[in-house]
């Protein structure tokens, strides 16, 4: 499954509605509302969690993935040392990373591409990607019907 920064993962494109996602992947393994009333879809087989934002007419705005099949720049990400992944990304508009620590986990956030590499024991365990917010403070939806 290819990660395309600013656009989505695999066939998932930011701005899709729930029905668009279900047409591609079927019903989710689990569906629930978060504390902000956003709809969350969880696809266990794909190891993906999708967030549809309530305030944006339930458009797909955020994806969390932990599948070992996730590819970024045609290379696997999950299970690899974060320093190795970051080194490969530095020349591809991923120069600046902010590090945040939570007990045994670290998050490395790249704002320009709205991506988080979550690590434990220095290896990437999850990748989070979100729709880009432009200078007008509006989402840049990539999905066009």
Show which residues each predicted segment covers.
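Short helix/turn-capping signatures at newly exposed starts of structured segments
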Residues: 1-145
